[in-house]
Amino acid sequence: MTSGFIIATLAIIVYSLWVRRDTWWTRWEVTATCAVAMEGCALLLMSPWAAPTVGVMLHQALGVWNVQQMLGHLCLIAAVSGNIYHMLVRLADPEQVKVLMRRQLMVPIWLGVAIMVPAFVLADQDYLPDFFSAPSANSLMIVYAVTGSAVVLYLSTYVSRLMLTLRQDPRAKTTIDLYLVSMGFAAAATTTVVASAWVEGDDAGPVIWACVCLSIGIFSYGSARSWRAKSAWFSPATAR
């Protein structure tokens, strides 16, 4: 079931990136497209498929197992940060956005990363094909899981507040509603990760994967829908 969720989500990501292919050169849209791409990278790195390939190569280079999982988690943090920037530039001047990002986002993000990376490395885990399906009671991994989840929840709350402001525009209402649902699944996934960090077993794995895939899939579809709606205004049919 997990593989089916991942494949379906990757298909939506590819669709979204194809729809948004022209936005790589659009100043106001490129960060949203980067966020979709980063979520795709995160999904691949966290997937059980990456463990016997990327995971083994990274272990040979660094001597630490499951590094690809940590990189996937960091990609998710980067994706949410990119989406926050995309929202902020619609509400404030770019120079003000830089100040806000530096003061309100970069500090908690870098503090979280400064805790997560050493905790992950020092935990000295064994090989795990699926990080979510084999939560560890290792105290350092609990620190890692709680810190990472706290960062994601903080960013999700921050971006949700921005979305509620942007939702006042009737043209953006449907897309913002999709984004809010996506953030809801993200919050559910991170909460389940924290809860499962203290429990031995693999019962939480399918729930976490379902929430992660639904969050990423809905966000990617919403991003594609948003750009199709915006680009329609410039089509010849609309111009007439």
Regions from the language model: what does each represent?
Residues 1-69, 172:
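Membrane-proximal first intracellular loop
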Residues 15-18, 68-106:
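Internal transmembrane alpha-helix with an interfacial aromatic "cap," most often the third helix
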Residues 24-37, 100-106, 171-182, 204-211:
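Membrane-interfacial loop-to-transmembrane alpha-helix junctions, especially the N-terminal start
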Residues 43-46, 114-124, 189-194:
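C-terminal TM-helix exit segments that contain a strictly Trp-centered aromatic cap at the helix terminus
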Residues 51-65, 125-140, 196-206:
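Membrane-interface interhelical loops and short amphipathic "cap" helices
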Residues 91-156:
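Membrane-proximal helix-loop-helix units in multi-pass membrane proteins
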Residues 150-240:
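C-terminal transmembrane-bundle signature of multipass membrane proteins
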